[in-house]
Amino acid sequence: MLLLGLLLLTALAGARLLWNKWKYRSLHLPPLAPGFLHLLQPDLPIYLLGLTQKLGPVYRLRLGLQDVVVLNSKRTIEEAMIRRWVDFAGRPQMPSYKLVSQPYQDLSLGDYSLLWKAHKKLTRSALLLGIRNSMEPLVEQLTQEFCERMRAQAGTPVAIQKEFSFLTCSVICCLTFGDKEDTLVHAFHDCVQDLMKSWEHWSIQVLDIVPFLRFFPNPGLQRLKQALENRDRIVEKQLRQHKDSMVAGQWRDMTDYMLQGMGKPRAEKGHGRLLEGHVHMSVVDLFIGGTETTATTLSWAVAFLLHHPEIQQRLQEELDCELGPGASGSRVPLKDPSRLPLLTATIAEVLRLRPVVPLALPHRTTRHSSILGYDIPEGTVVIPNLQGAHLDDTVWEQPHEFRPDRFLVPGASPRVLAFGCGARVCLGEPLARLELFVVLARLLHAFTLLPPTGPLPSLRPRSHCGINLTMQPFQVQLQPRGAVAPGPSQHQ
């Protein structure tokens, strides 16, 4: 049976390659990279960037039964995702995507359509309008509580990655459900951890390359289905509670806003109706996209500062100059980041060197298009190599070096693409940037980051086939610099 399946798969692959070669014989396609085992590379984004030396910034890879176009420069990514955004706004409907999202109701993984646009508008409005006034004070409050917990562990090694993860999960829980109760936060945190671990396993990722394998026994697939059932059970419970208690015309959190907004008439006609399933998947996207991503970036920032204590000292001097020595009662000037230019530059440099999603989720062309003069047929899968674009030595001087000062000269360095760009830009970017700014400012103002006994944390990403650019576990010792600044409630 297995041999027959492999023979059939080989025959189908050969037939498809011949068909595509005939179908696109008159087109000027990007060059094709030799080989077909590209995904086995331990540091895939860097490997893909290396191929540009021979093939240029746009080329094709053969993955399974299809060719995939890779964009490796800021210029090509912005040309596709901003100037030709409609052409490249689609999302391929791969087996793993269909598995982890309710049918065609997911925002991050859903294909481009009028209904998708309405779904995006509702979620964006919930983030920017529904909770606009509560976002900043909430992040301040939870960060202050985080610093108090860290002060209680001062002088002992702390697994800072886990602490950041609970902090960011608490923020999302409060904004989404209006609740930071420990039981709920722990339930969602464990759910997200389990789900991402299951989804990123090679036994799931390979199904997108060789879909035929889904018909064979797969323990990893069963674990993922169990994680999805747990996820949906938790979200559905919260949706029921909100529907039973919300008041029309008022909203306590994002879930209230989206549940009430999904039934409102839309300006666009013919796109269908937003359903509760769309709200369900928006909640899922907020937790998946807003918990581990921000926590990982914060962890990378701490690791880089442990390697560069001179940058940490300059940051603390900047904070002391703006907020007072040690820890004072002043609030971080969130509405004017220019008052803390080195902190802003340091965040930008961390995002440049370690974009948490180094290879953006695949796009799909909605119609025939072109990039740098190459034809890109309709239905082509396109992958932006964000980390590759950030390490392009034709754009960045000494691209592999940690140099926040490169962002201190206005116009000297381009804006990083860590959150994507165009129609598929991360909707949570404003919240993520707010968290990065507040947490690092509060943390560095209150503590000096010191490495515990032993080697410094590794700056090499963990090698795996997942989506996020994760790092090796490490610990940090927090040395208090003075009394922690009072919380927002004391500044009335």
UniProtKB/Swiss-Prot annotation:
Keyword Lipid biosynthesis attributed: no
Subcellular location: Endoplasmic reticulum membrane; Microsome membrane
Family: Belongs to the cytochrome P450 family.
Entry binding sites for heme b: 91, 120, 363, 424, 426
Keyword Heme: yes
Binding site for progesterone: 231
Enzyme Commission number(s): 1.14.14.16
Topology relative to the membrane: Peripheral membrane protein
Catalytic activity of the protein: 17alpha-hydroxyprogesterone + reduced [NADPH--hemoprotein reductase] + O2 = 11-deoxycortisol + oxidized [NADPH--hemoprotein reductase] + H2O + H(+); progesterone + reduced [NADPH--hemoprotein reductase] + O2 = 21-hydroxyprogesterone + oxidized [NADPH--hemoprotein reductase] + H2O + H(+)
Free-text comment on this protein's domains from its UniProt entry: The leucine-rich hydrophobic amino acid N-terminal region probably helps to anchor the protein to the microsomal membrane.
Molecular-function GO terms, alphabetical: 17-hydroxyprogesterone 21-hydroxylase activity; heme binding; iron ion binding; progesterone 21-hydroxylase activity; steroid 17-alpha-monooxygenase activity; steroid binding; steroid hydroxylase activity
A GO BP annotation: progesterone metabolic process
Uppermost EC category: oxidoreductase
Keyword line: Endoplasmic reticulum, Heme, Iron, Lipid-binding, Membrane, Metal-binding, Microsome, Monooxygenase, Oxidoreductase, Steroid-binding, Steroidogenesis
Binding site for 17alpha-hydroxyprogesterone: 231
Subcellular location, principal: endoplasmic reticulum
Name of the featured protein: Steroid 21-hydroxylase
GO CC entries: endoplasmic reticulum membrane
Lineage summary: Eukaryota, Metazoa, Chordata, Craniata, Vertebrata
Cofactor: heme b
Known function: Specifically catalyzes the 21-hydroxylation of steroids. Required for the adrenal synthesis of mineralocorticoids and glucocorticoids.
